From Swiss-Prot:
Residues 313-326 have a biased composition (Acidic residues). It comes from Homo sapiens (Human). It comes from the Eukaryota. Pfam families: Mst1_SARAH (PF11629), Pkinase (PF00069). This is Serine/threonine-protein kinase 4. The active site is at residue 149. Its EC number is 2.7.11.1. It is linked to Immunodeficiency 110 with lymphoproliferation: An autosomal recessive, primary T-cell immunodeficiency syndrome characterized by progressive loss of naive T-cells, recurrent bacterial, viral, and fungal infections, warts, and abscesses, autoimmune manifestations, and cardiac malformations, including atrial septal defect. Patients are at risk for developing lymphoproliferative disorders or lymphoma. It catalyses: L-seryl-[protein] + ATP = O-phospho-L-seryl-[protein] + ADP + H(+); L-threonyl-[protein] + ATP = O-phospho-L-threonyl-[protein] + ADP + H(+). The modification N-acetylmethionine is found at residue 1. The modification Phosphoserine is found at residues 265, 320, 410, 414. Autophosphorylated on serine and threonine residues. Phosphorylation at Thr-387 by PKB/AKT1, leads to inhibition of its: kinase activity, nuclear translocation and autophosphorylation at Thr-183. It also diminishes its cleavage by caspases and its ability to phosphorylate FOXO3. Proteolytically cleaved by caspase-3 during apoptosis at Asp-326 and Asp-349 resulting in a 37 kDa or a 39 kDa subunit respectively. The 39 kDa subunit is further cleaved into the 37 kDa form. Proteolytic cleavage results in kinase activation and nuclear translocation of the truncated form (MST1/N). It is less likely that cleavage at Asp-349 is a prerequisite for activation as this site is not conserved in the murine ortholog. It is found in: Cytoplasm; Nucleus. Residues 290-310 form a coiled coil.
Amino acid sequence: METVQLRNPPRRQLKKLDEDSLTKQPEEVFDVLEKLGEGSYGSVYKAIHKETGQIVAIKQVPVESDLQEIIKEISIMQQCDSPHVVKYYGSYFKNTDLWIVMEYCGAGSVSDIIRLRNKTLTEDEIATILQSTLKGLEYLHFMRKIHRDIKAGNILLNTEGHAKLADFGVAGQLTDTMAKRNTVIGTPFWMAPEVIQEIGYNCVADIWSLGITAIEMAEGKPPYADIHPMRAIFMIPTNPPPTFRKPELWSDNFTDFVKQCLVKSPEQRATATQLLQHPFVRSAKGVSILRDLINEAMDVKLKRQESQQREVDQDDEENSEEDEMDSGTMVRAVGDEMGTVRVASTMTDGANTMIEHDDTLPSQLGTMVINAEDEEEEGTMKRRDETMQPAKPSFLEYFEQKEKENQINSFGKSVPGPLKNSSDWKIPQDGDYEFLKSWTVEDLQKRLLALDPMMEQEIEEIRQKYQSKRQPILDAIEAKKRRQQNF
């Protein structure tokens, strides 16, 4: 028995990469197995740590991404040590990519599981996931950190069913001198009203997002998911808190839990610690109840992978009729002895198991970062005169200013009348819309349809404006990065 133990000593668990590992090239330390999906700022891969045999997740981030946000994500993960938060092991620079090595959660995100099974979650399943998520939020908030992007796509499950918070690409740190933040950041449908209004917010902004996430897990998508994100941004602060579409389907405890999360006044909203004592959470069952849905989702994923592999093999067979093949993986170039290697991908976006930004919605929402220039330094805040009326968010002010400029440029050049081209519509300067009564329904519908393209164009102009500011900074960072071997 002793001989067996000596021959097969148990491998130690990876806790953090040591200095020796960090001075090597990442390929010497890890074997990358497959692509898992897309996270904030980069792609996520499944890999194995050669020394311990432990499976890890590696986020590969191009250096042209927002390096400041990436470094912030690393910094926050480094400071966290909780079973309810994804662990960080270390980072590397490799060619034009930053490799961030993190804990691997084999079951993927909650939104992945919903999508793979094409089925929403039961109350028992939701309660168990919320309990772990609240413990993660309680830990983060105790550390004075705000996640700022809580949603089903950022809650990962390991194969045992333990939920962990992930994707800290937009997380923020609160300091003693900065009780509230004033930047609009997060994913639109999950945003708290005070975040959208830019009136300052603290940790309980995550609680609002958690309430929206609870509805998302129950109904498959968050409230307002069927409308344009920019319209949702107008509606969230002005409308009453959202509720279930069919309240009669859900228990009083679950309904009350969501109600406690979705209180519009942040001062009256419950904290993570308080919600852990809520009857809905206290009655949560163990993680074993999640194993069936995890196994079902992983079976669906495996079948999709096998189907995709068959398609790849079939394509290879069809191509072999035209090219000389060697073992199905080597395509010999005509007239060239050495040939050309063809790498066959066995994964597509449909088989992801980590974080995908389409979540459970039909459109790719991603993470919206508005007014991002205030994030360049953690301590920067916008202060408002509290004696003034609540100011409009900066992105709304931009749209209004842009429209005024268009009105001035077009004043006197057009007369309100039937629509000829939906793209040339100008809002009347005097705000008089009486002339609309004389238009046909068809003209009105055309003008309504013209609003979204106009808005998208203005958003793109904003993006280009900030990109022109960011690029010189990114160029300087890349120049410095070239002088480093490892991060």
